[in-house]
Amino acid sequence: SVKTAWILLILMLFFSLFIVLAIPTESRNLCLLLATLSLPFILLYPSAKRWFKYPQLILSICWGFSVLIPWAASESSLAGGVTLLFCWLATIFWTFGFDTVYAMADEFDDKEIGLNSSAISLGRNSIKAVSICYFVASFLLAIAAFKATLGLIFWPFWLISTLGMQREVFLLSSKSKGIKTSGLHFSNQVRIGSLLLLGMILSKII
């Protein structure tokens, strides 16, 4: 209902304000600038399926700010060199890949009502494109990890995650592009990301 929507909006704004106030003073202006720069992409995305062949790219850019803003909050700058750049690019490729899979579930309905998606635009090459996106994301993360001098313990986690991504692509088929398959694929990407995060944390504390 409208009332529920307003309540949720007020709660989200309250928590957002709390997060902003929790950011170190020296980082706050840069974080707010990045958040402002992300707004055009966030506002464009809901309508992008009507006028852009690859709306998933806009969503990927939105997700990319989830790398830039925490980095800015931690370092008070974007001077992260190759590590930051490649983490950002990896996020964009990874997001484009799994959201393309998610778009496969809506492919028939989107065609019926004249909407666009990367799944429709890529057609038969969509699964191959997802595989390439995952490979590029893994490769970029490997370079970023190397430049960040992560410990040896990270690399088994990276290898398992990389193989896991490609396994998920292998399990996709033209006969199983339904909501359930796409949802499971999306959930497994969360698990793979959590595995990578665990590897990063362990490499810093062991």
PLM region descriptions:
Residues 1-35, 112-152, 158:
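Multi-pass membrane catalytic core of lipid/isoprenoid biosynthesis enzymes
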Residues 2-82, 86, 167-173, 185:
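Intramembrane alpha-helical segments
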Residues 13-16, 39-42, 63-64, 91, ...:
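Residue-level recognition of pore/gate-forming positions within transmembrane alpha-helices
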Residues 18-27, 67-74, 90-101, 144-148, ...:
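Alpha-helical membrane-embedding segments
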Residues 82-94, 150-158:
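Alpha-helical transmembrane segments
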Residues 99-124, 170-181:
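Cytosolic, membrane-interface loops and tails of multi-pass inner-membrane proteins
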Residues 139, 143-206:
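Extended hydrophobic alpha-helices typical of membrane-associated regions
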